[in-house]
Curated annotation (Swiss-Prot):
Region of interest (G1), ranges: 19-26
Protein name: Elongation factor Tu
Swiss-Prot/TrEMBL keywords: Cytoplasm, Elongation factor, GTP-binding, Hydrolase, Magnesium, Metal-binding, Nucleotide-binding, Protein biosynthesis
Chain residue ranges for the region called G2: 60-64
Domain spans labelled tr-type G: 10-204
Annotated residues for binding of GTP: 19-26, 81-85, 136-139
One of the record's GO molecular function terms: GTP binding
CDD domains cross-referenced by the UniProt entry: EF_Tu (cd01884), EFTU_II (cd03697), EFTU_III (cd03707)
Gene, per the UniProt record: tuf
């Protein structure tokens, strides 16, 4: 079977379904694919295909996720659905599936539940830009006023976590009825996707963001200067542009990129995704090291103290066998390097067990270029014991 060509004419976005267990996330995922398939835009997916999610390994963490794709008039979507609550937590913290937006599924019969709140908080912490709400199972609720009440509750909850609760589209429907082919409820799925098209912003492409490249290796070329190699994480760099070298020391230094090489060929510029060598003017071999980043001046700064959301690997995932406490000192692995840091647990949290997710304060022994949303692993003795994302920078 010949591979279909990926259609680039439509913009692409990654989305997912989030919400409390059994509120209908997977049924909704199946309904979206099925209803859009009727409109000739997608391949129908059965509930079973989505629910039997294969295990994936992301940084050694076992996550069950289902990926399906579908298209609307406006966009091509990659949609991720996770069967279990733990899978969501891991997925969002590790960034295994980056989401440009999400559909929050709330059962109209039950209203918001603990995981509803937790998924909204996680979405806020890991930087999901926008949420759209699907009030599911409305066929099971006869009372109009009850529906309005649930909608108000959901909006309040979103506002509590800094999402625009008053403006978020809330679509009421029944994923199951839509799957069964009920035309009125199929229309609700189309309404939902229209809301997703309109309300979830067009993702900014990595190449449009400010330039940043984590340094993987450094060497000097006699007569030409120092070359830093790595993969451009975001943005573009043109020959002759000024950059900053950030991290591992208090002071950042500025220099000019006098050459960009890829596969031994000289380029005028490089962009996100390219593996390059950047020739740096007037920089000695000792001024640059692995673990630093090259970045557009003023766009990212070095820090040692931050708050983070962390998932701690379970014993089965190759993590620790025992809990850890405040003052735990593991290595924090950012992009290309390990830095020792001290963990401070929140008040009321005595210890953290393998398999938990926790908010913690971290202080690193040397500054690293970080910002809200920067991801890292926690390692000890070379093995990964946790995965986290920076939520607040303290200093």
């Amino acid at each position: 079977m010949a591979k279909e060509k990926f259609d680039r004419s439509k913009e692409h976005a990654n989305i997912g379904t989030i919400g409390h267990v059994d509120h209908g996330k997977t049924t909704l995922t199946a309904a979206i694919a099925t209803v859009l398939a009727k409109n000739g835009d997608s391949v129908a997916q059965s509930y079973d295909m989505i629910d039997n999610a294969p295990e994936e390994k992301e940084r050694g963490i076992t996550i069950n996720t289902s990926h399906i794709e579908y298209t609307t008039d406006k966009r091509h979507y990659a949609h991720v659905d996770c069967p279990g609550h733990a899978d969501y937590v891991k997925n969002m913290i590790t960034g295994a599936a980056q989401m440009d937006g999400a559909i929050l599924v709330v059962s109209a019969a039950d209203g918001p539940m603990p995981q509803t709140r937790e998924h909204i908080l996680l979405s806020r912490n890991v930087g999901v830009p926008a949420l759209v709400v699907f009030l599911n199972k409305v066929d099971m609720v006869d009372d109009e006023e009850l529906l309005e009440l649930v909608e108000m509750e959901v909006r309040d909850l979103l506002s509590e976590y800094d999402f625009p609760g008053d403006d978020v589209p809330v679509i009421s429907g029944s994923a199951l009825k839509a799957l069964e082919g009920d035309a009125d409820y199929e229309q609700k799925i189309l309404d939902l996707m229209q809301a997703v098209d309109d309300f979830i912003p067009t993702p900014e492409r990595d190449s449009d963001k400010p330039f940043m490249m984590p340094v993987e290796d450094v060497f000097s070329i006699t007569g030409r200067g120092t070359v830093a190699t790595g993969r451009v994480e975001r943005g573009q760099i043109k020959v002759g542009e000024e950059i900053e070298i950030i991290g591992m020391q208090e002071e950042s230094s500025k220099t000019t990129v006098t050459g960009v090489e890829m596969f031994r060929k000289l380029l005028d510029y490089a962009e996100a995704g390219d593996n390059i060598g950047a020739l740096l003017r007037g920089v000695s071999r000792d001024d640059v090291q692995r673990g630093q980043v090259l970045a557009a001046p003023g766009t990212i700064t070095p820090h040692t103290k931050f708050k983070a959301d962390v998932y701690v690997l379970s014993k089965d995932e190759g993590g620790r066998h025992t809990p850890f406490f405040t003052n735990y000192r593991p290595q924090f692995y950012f992009r290309t390097t390990d830095v020792t840091g001290v963990v401070n647990l929140p008040e009321g949290t005595e210890m953290v067990m393998p398999g938990d997710n926790v908010e913690m304060d971290v202080e690193l022994i040397s500054p690293i270029a970080i910002e809200d949303g920067t991801r890292f692993s926690i390692r000890e003795g070379g093995r990964t014991v946790g995965s986290g994302v920076v939520t607040v920078i303290n200093e």
